[in-house]
């Protein structure tokens, strides 16, 4: 496990913790030395000033991929986001090969993350899988999550499938979302990513207050697509 701070609880199976800043290419490479798989989940997880997103998400991912190239790591799993396609309409079941329509600067940073993964797969032969992660929560707590929820159980299943995908997989992008009845995104092709999600947010619909209807003509991102969601992160 690699993090900027020491976790409050030790990792499972007596794993080793490395305290590393993703902005430091030398220490990233040192920490990854000897690994054969990398699950890269680090970065700024939501809308923020663009310089912060570029530094953590884009430059940090570049350091991970470059370390993988230099040390001979076989597979890199990159955490992308559903926010890469947040401006597609809610009524459209979106697939991973459709054009990016990011709903904010965070989504833009994840478009760049995927592009870096594609570059390192095409140019340097790394095996790279990008998972466009849904709303990762213990249970859905707001109306949009009825479409976007990713349960902990399904998250583990997707990650395991990505790590064990055939070695012939050079580059793959897939949505990591539970099998929600109202989902916006296509589930992965089982021939590419061998996992079938099992949890459905609809089982929790009665627990969520408010109007649960989704405007089919509105953006999948919902409130994240509003101008103010990005503008409030401007620096003075």
Q: Where does each model-flagged region fall?
A:
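Flexible, glycine-rich beta-alpha linker
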Residues: 101, 123-146
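Conserved C-terminal active-site "lid" loop/helix of NAD(P)H-dependent oxidoreductases
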Residues: 173-174, 179-196, 207-235
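Conserved Rossmann-fold NAD(P)-dependent oxidoreductase catalytic core, especially the SDR/UDP-sugar
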Residues: 63-103
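Glycine-rich NAD(P)-binding loop of the Rossmann-fold in SDR/ketoreductase-type enzymes
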Residues: 23, 52-63, 71, 82, ...
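NAD(P)H-binding glycine-rich loop region in Rossmannoid oxidoreductase-like domains
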Residues: 20-56
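Rossmann-fold cofactor-recognition segment
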Residues: 4-6, 11-24
């Amino acid at each position: 496990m690699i993090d900027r701070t020491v976790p409050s609880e030790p990792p499972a199976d007596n794993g080793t913790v490395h305290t590393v800043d993703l902005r430091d290419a030398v220490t990233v490479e040192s920490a990854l030395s000897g690994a054969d798989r990398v699950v890269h989940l680090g970065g700024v997880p939501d809308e923020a000033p663009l310089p912060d997103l570029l530094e953590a998400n884009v430059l940090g991912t570049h350091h991970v991929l470059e370390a993988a190239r230099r040390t001979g790591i076989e597979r890199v799993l990159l955490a992308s986001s559903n926010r890469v396609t947040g401006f597609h309409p809610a009524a459209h079941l979106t697939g991973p090969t459709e054009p990016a329509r990011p709903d904010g600067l965070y989504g833009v940073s994840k478009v760049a993350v995927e592009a870096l993964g594609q570059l390192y797969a095409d140019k340097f032969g790394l095996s790279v899988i990008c998972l466009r992660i849904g709303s990762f929560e213990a249970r859905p707590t707001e109306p949009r999550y009825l479409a976007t929820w990713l349960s902990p159980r399904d998250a583990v299943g997707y990650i395991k499938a990505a790590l064990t995908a055939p070695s012939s997989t050079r580059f793959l992008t897939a949505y990591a979302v539970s099998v929600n009845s109202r989902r916006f995104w296509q589930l992965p092709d089982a021939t590419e990513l061998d996992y079938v999600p099992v949890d459905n947010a609809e089982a929790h619909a009665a627990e969520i207050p408010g109007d649960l209807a989704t405007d089919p003509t509105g953006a999948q991102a919902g409130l994240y697509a509003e101008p103010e969601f990005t503008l409030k992160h401007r620096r003075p």
